[in-house]
Amino acid sequence: MAYNQEDSKRLSDKYKKEGHFDKLKREILSNPWNNTEENSESFEQALRKRVASTVKEMVNEDEELIFKNRGLTSALIESQLVKDNYLKLGSKMEGDNGDGEKKFDLDVYVRSKLQDPKLLEMIKGQLQETLNSYEEEANGST
């Protein structure tokens, strides 16, 4: 069967609706972000700490942020984080001992997780199941 771009979009939408994307996100967020330490916190916990620390630094630099509209402040902070590809999150965090051990690189972490062969096989399997379900629905409606 030949597939087109519209079929790809439908498959992607179905994959998301079945909750596979959310499961994948939870899987990545719940993994320890620093496997070199015992009892390493989850990636989500580390990310939350980094965001909180970065926002605190930003407010210290520009106290006017706390007096602005909440939505505007959120948008300003988000744009500051996004514009440099989240590099601000990798800067030294309060409590780091300066030894460089706790370098936090969001992009490197996510890419490494997405290149994990086990995870890729799981995604391929889920996509195949979703495709089979999609084809069954398409054949049943014709």
Curated annotation (Swiss-Prot):
One of its GO terms (biological process) is chromatin remodeling. The keyword Nucleus applies. The keyword Coiled coil does not apply. InterPro entries: BOD1/SHG1_dom. One of its GO terms (cellular component) is Set1C/COMPASS complex. Keywords: Nucleus. It is found in: Nucleus. Its main location: nucleus. The COMPASS (Set1C) complex specifically mono-, di- and trimethylates histone H3 to form H3K4me1/2/3, which subsequently plays a role in telomere length maintenance and transcription elongation regulation. Present with 1520 molecules/cell in log phase SD medium. Belongs to the SHG1 family. Component of the Set1C/COMPASS complex which consists of SET1(2), BRE2(2), SPP1(2), SDC1(1), SHG1(1), SWD1(1), SWD2(1), and SWD3(1). This is COMPASS component SHG1. It comes from Saccharomyces cerevisiae (strain ATCC 204508 / S288c) (Baker's yeast).
